[in-house]
Amino acid sequence: MISIAQISDTHLLCPVNVGETDIVKQRINNLKRCVDSINNLDPQPDIIIHTGDVTQNGTVEEYTIADSILKKLKQSIIFTPGNRDNKPNLRKIFTQSLSEKTDKEFYIYSIEFKGFKLISMDTFCSNSNKGELTSSKIKLLSNEISRSKSLPTAIFMHHPPYNVSDNEFERIEYVDIEEVKKFHYFLKNKSNIIALFCGHIHKYFESNIGHIRTFTMPSIATDLSWDKEISKKSKKIQYLLHSFSKKTGNLYKKNISSVVRILKKLVNHDK
């Protein structure tokens, strides 16, 4: 069994740069409350993942604020960059979480524990707030997957590579839809990939890409949440808990979904 706490889209701001506004204080307080809630979980998650947009402007000062809060977590945290992040500054402040694991250009890396694998997929695009999936990135991802094909694998990335619209108009947050189609084809041919964890759209959304379960979570910054009923009125902090467990006595075969149980829980914290 492995348990993962997912947070995303904290969008922290630096008071020095924008003044002591209510939004600055609120976002800092949101993250502090989230950390307190995760630290009070029993049992504790095995690891915490942050699926991007740690800060609003990507400054060292903003990441320093994030670090002062996130270092209070009882368990380790790992990151994948969002469109608002500055990757060199993210690496500079969160050295232990990133520097030895990431490619110089792309933040694509993996960790293995308890018989499972987690892979960060970098969807950052230098000239757009939308995501980018290039052949170079997919090749690096493929290399990470191929190192341990027998392990059930979850990918965490900022931009969800699927339609996130609740209405008839399709909304896919990528600069090149053809890249997304190629990525889907790639994923569907990898039977050991069991889940994608995403952020970016600031609301809870669940879908599938073939056999793969996909989860997109709300923003920790409640003023940016699409779920205004929750964020504005009740001020609840939301994050996701994911648990994977193997069925005893079974070997991993082609249909990985038959031997891995995926549970998700939306946690509302309203102290």
PLM region spans:
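Short glycine-enriched, charge-decorated loop/helix-capping segments at active-site entrances
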Residues: 18-25, 168-174, 230
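Active-site-proximal beta-strand elements of phosphoester/diester hydrolases
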Residues: 2-16, 115-125, 154-156, 212-218, ...
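A short C-terminal boundary segment appended to hydrolase-like catalytic domains
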Residues: 243-271
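N-terminal active-site segment of His-dependent metallophosphoesterases
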Residues: 1-64
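Active-site neighborhood of phospho(di)ester-bond hydrolases with catalytic His/Asp-centered motifs
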Residues: 6-8, 47-53, 77-83, 122, ...
